[in-house]
Curated annotation (Swiss-Prot):
Protein name, per record: Large ribosomal subunit protein bL20
A Pfam family: Ribosomal_L20
Presence of the UniProt keyword Transcription regulation in the record: no
HAMAP family the record matches: Ribosomal_bL20
Keyword annotations of the record: Ribonucleoprotein, Ribosomal protein, RNA-binding, rRNA-binding
GO CC annotations on file: ribonucleoprotein complex; ribosome
Domain of life: Bacteria
Chain's role: Binds directly to 23S ribosomal RNA and is necessary for the in vitro assembly process of the 50S ribosomal subunit. It is not involved in the protein synthesizing functions of that subunit.
Length: 134
């Protein structure tokens, strides 16, 4: 059986790691041991931050919606509740976009949410336990 020398595969693996570490500062870009550690850590950060990006974008959309809704005399929570009661299912990304680029359409959404909240407020049945003697 022939002897297998690992030089070619080892060189390919090292080259792959060093290519991924291109742009790093100092010894981390050209020493295989530190480059491998830095690349591994950067992949962990990338994985974590892909999850965090979703959170931060949702928070941004909510802040934008809240600002636009407060200009029209409603809070974010009441607005979302009103949309749900009105049967309007639009996600926060689209709501944020509408609030920025089409204020008239957003005003119509706010009006329909207010109308749904007001309608349900007037038609609620009284609580059966109110006024009961204990």
């Amino acid at each position: 059986m022939a002897r297998v020398k690992r030089g070619v595969t080892a060189h390919a693996k090292h080259k792959k790691v060093l290519d991924q570490a291109a742009g790093f500062r100092g010894r981390r870009k050209n020493t295989i041991r530190t480059a491998k550690a830095a690349v591994d850590r950067s992949k962990q950060y990338a994985y974590r931050d892909r999850k965090n990006r979703k959170r931060s974008f949702r928070a941004l959309w909510i802040q934008r919606i809240n600002a636009a809704v407060r200009e029209q005399g409603l809070t974010y929570g009441r607005f979302i509740d009103g949309l749900a009661k009105a049967g309007i299912e639009i996600d926060r990304k689209v709501l944020s976009d509408i609030a920025i680029h089409e204020p008239d359409a957003f005003g119509a959404l706010v009006a329909s949410a207010k109308k749904a909240l007001e309608y349900l407020k007037n038609t609620e049945t009284p609580n059966a336990f109110e006024g009961a003697v204990r």
